[in-house]
Every structure is written in structure tokens, then in C-alpha cells.
Amino acid sequence: MEAMNREVHVPFCERLLGRFRRSTHLTAIPELLNLLEIKGCIVTIDAMRCQKEIAKTILEREAEYLLAVKGNQGKLEAAFDKHFPLSSLSHYSGDYYNTEEKGHGRSEQRLHLVSDVIGDFVDLSFEWPGLKTLGVAISFRQEGDDIRDKTMSVRYYISSAKLTAKEFAKAIRAHWQIEVQLHWKLDVAMREDECRIRRGDAAENLAGFRHVAMNLLTNEKTVKAGIKRKRLKAALSPDYLALVLAGQGLS
């Protein structure tokens, strides 16, 4: 389990050891949150961890939550389906924000809608402490020029923060950077999935070293290259390795 600071794009909490390792993610996350200084932050968590106790813990730490909603919270999902049917979103009269990105042969348009607590959500707000904002994110993605390759996805969110549509869009977009900035780098650049070391705490210890190395290489800005190339350069060049370490006062 990892936590990541969206503003600086580096992970700051490694896999939980000891008693946490024997816990499920649902019980470990509140304990992880209690280890972090999150006051004044917006904590974004995926749908699997959209749980009332996690939301409560975040508020107790004087932070705000932004949680994705899926079928594991049936009443919330049903309320979204009822109050935000796709047929009505094209002429939505509330606050909304559009974005569009193109690159690598594909284009993606995103529509972000926010609303105050309405309808069935008023009753649900007694179960979800601090609930203030409902969010819907709709994305249209097309590969190449063929309109038949266009796909649509709809995602629902709840938040204790009072968010504008633009703020909502920025927050959920930043959340998905975790997949690219953290998991992709660990799996591809650091080859974590290929590691077969399992004995004792060795896997967790090596994962910690990978995070340290990844953070050091990410923060080294003199070489314009990806993590994989920087890693190889540091292995072959003692001078560059010293530069990487010196940037963090470790040489």
C-alpha cells in the first residue's frame, strides 16, 4: 500500500509492515492516515476503499475526502443513477467544466459536473459525514480517426469539500497520476513485478529501497531522461550517482 503527494509527485509512504501487513486495506488505511500529516489536504481514494469509516477518519484528521463511488456502495450508486441520468447531462444547468487532450494518436474529452447534496443524497449524508459535493466525470476517448473506436466512461464521486467543477476536475485528474507516476514507474522503470524475492521482510525492504531510488532519480533534473535511463546512468557513472545523492544531501 502506498500514499502519494500529488503536488510533488513522489510517494512518501511505503508498504505498511508489522501488524498492518496482516490487516486488510480497509482496516490499514485508517491507520495509515493516522501516520500522515494531512490537515488541510484533500485525500482522494479509489472506489474499493470508499467506506464510511475511512471518510470519518479523514475528517477527524482535519482533512477533506474525495471518494470514487461504484457498486460496493449500492445506495450511493443508485442515487447517482437516479439523479444524474445520462440523458439529462447534455443540458446540465449546474456548474460544469470541460477539458480536451490529444496526443499519441488518441483524443480524450472530459466533462466534469458538480452539485450540492440533493434528493436521496440528503438522507445518505447522515451516513456519510461531512458530505457536501457530488461529482460526475464523463470521458469520451477515441483511438485514431475512426469514430467507431470512441468509448465513454462515467465515474461518480462524493466529497466533503465544497468544490467547483474545475477544482473537482483537477483533483480527480491528479489522482490518476498515481497510476502513471508511481505504479508505472515501479513496474516498468524499476521492474518491481519481475522481483521474485519473497523470504521474510525482504520484499518489503527492497520495495522501500526502490521508492527511495525512484524519488532520488525523479528529483534529479540535470539529465533530461526517464527514470529507467537515469537508473542505468547512475549504475555506470560514479560521478552521476554522486550527483543524484548530492541533490538530497546524501553524498
Regions found by a protein language model. Name each.
Residues 93, 185-251:
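A short, flexible helix-boundary coil/loop motif
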Residues 70-173:
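An anionic, glycine-rich sequence signature occurring as long contiguous blocks
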Residues 55-63, 85:
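Short, surface-exposed basic-aromatic patches at helix termini and helix-loop junctions that form
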Residues 1-4:
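Methionine residue identity
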Residues 65-68:
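Short hydrophobic alpha-helical runs that function as membrane-insertion/retention elements
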Residues 158, 162-197:
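Short amphipathic alpha-helical "interface-anchor" segments enriched in bulky aromatics
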Residues 25-45, 50-53:
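Conserved, well-structured functional cores that handle cations and Mg-NTP chemistry
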